[in-house]
Amino acid sequence: MEDQLTIFIISDSLGETAKAIAKACLSQFPGHDDWHFQCFSYINSQERLEQVFEEASQKTVFMMFSLVDVALASYAQKRCESEHYAYVDLLTNVIQGISRISGIDPLGEPGILRRLDNDYFKRVESIEFAVKYDDGRDPRGILQADLVIIGISRTSKTPLSMFLADKNIKVINIPLVPEVPVPKELRMIDSRRIIGLTNSVDHLNQVRKVRLKSLGLSSTANYASLERILEETRYAEEVMKNLGCPIINVSDKAIEETATIILEILKTNGQVAKNL
């Protein structure tokens, strides 16, 4: 229709936030479907704003702008008022109110929320990576990982991988088993990207018995025997020594405590610093 009602979304970033607010508000008017969205992204100068108003001149327009630049937002308000456009400034009053109460000046940088969204998606990617390569499912992931955690069974490899993935670090964990050759990829990367985990024999004996019980198996199985645990522990320590990687004993440590130690080691070694 010629007099179609149009919402102009004017933003110094993508305009997704403003559009989401507009849609939420329009849901209160279910009987009216003549609204049309027109999004103007990355409006960062008065010249570009002028072009938006030129386009609005022949339409019935409601202006919604999300501009962190105070001068630009003020200009948009004045133009709307002088040309009798209905409008709402989504950011100025909120930012000024927060600044007044907190005593902190705003950054005035457009696109910050978008950068935060990018961090979120990177974190999701890291978590998906940890799940995909959990428990050595595909050793080729070693070459793509920021961090490789190695250790025998029940040394908290998986929960640590997930915890660190939430810190935006791509982690793969590799189980060390005497009968299984060490992945060749471990010798193809910087040993500072590898962390070895150990545990006390007594603690491993206890947690493995609990694990067997949860699976409905006998606690006397070889998996939980002291002889087997000693064999695995000696083998793992020899592998870690040959690789020259840092080793952490996780006995009596919470996941968060071990993760903090790992993060400090990575920072000291200059590894994955971009994520920390």
Curated annotation (Swiss-Prot):
Its EC number is 2.7.11.32, 2.7.4.27. ADP binds at G151, I152, S153, R154, T155, S156, K157, T158. GO terms for molecular function: ADP binding; ATP binding; phosphotransferase activity, phosphate group as acceptor; protein serine/threonine kinase activity. Keywords: Kinase, Nucleotide-binding, Serine/threonine-protein kinase, Transferase. InterPro entries: Kinase-pyrophosphorylase, PPDK_reg. It catalyses: N(tele)-phospho-L-histidyl/L-threonyl-[pyruvate, phosphate dikinase] + ADP = N(tele)-phospho-L-histidyl/O-phospho-L-threonyl-[pyruvate, phosphate dikinase] + AMP + H(+); N(tele)-phospho-L-histidyl/O-phospho-L-threonyl-[pyruvate, phosphate dikinase] + phosphate + H(+) = N(tele)-phospho-L-histidyl/L-threonyl-[pyruvate, phosphate dikinase] + diphosphate. It is an enzyme of class 2 (transferase). Bifunctional serine/threonine kinase and phosphorylase involved in the regulation of the pyruvate, phosphate dikinase (PPDK) by catalyzing its phosphorylation/dephosphorylation. Belongs to the pyruvate, phosphate/water dikinase regulatory protein family. PDRP subfamily. This is Putative pyruvate, phosphate dikinase regulatory protein.
